[in-house]
Amino acid sequence: MTTSDGIKVVLSGENCRDWNGIHYREGMSRKNVGATKLSMNVATIPPGGVAFAHVHVDFELMLYILEGRVRHEYGDGLTEVVENKAGDFIFIGAGVPHEVFNMSETDPVVAVVARSDADEWQNIVPYEGRVQRHAADTSSRGE
């Protein structure tokens, strides 16, 4: 990281972190730039990867898909579905349960992730409330 009179820069190639099936390049947060309300990084979901069901407690999240196709199952019981591709923006409200699937078995999903929480990881909790589905409902996920 470099600093100059109020502007802080995180250089590409600096630290990485894996969490819940997703690879994150270090971005900006409270821990490295002193942000007080925001954090941002780049996330990669490997081919066929899943970020298992979780909830962002008390913060919102925005995604911009750079590469790939992604499916979110969300809401109570994870019964709602939305699919997105490169060029799409996605907003996830605070407290919305969701699970994320890379729809490709050969290509990664790469997205810019921005959060209204400077602490990044501390306010994310697992979600256990998936509604059981019928086989026909899960065939597109390879279950």
Residue positions per predicted region:
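A short, N-terminal "cap"/entry segment at the start of jelly-roll beta-barrel domains
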Residues: M1-K37, F52, P126-E143
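Conserved short histidine dyad/triad with adjacent acidic residue
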Residues: E26, N41-V57
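Hydrophobic beta-strand core residues of beta-sandwich domains
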Residues: N32, I45, N84, I90-I92
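Short strand-connecting beta-turns/loops that link adjacent beta-strands
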Residues: N32-V33, D58, G77, E105-D107
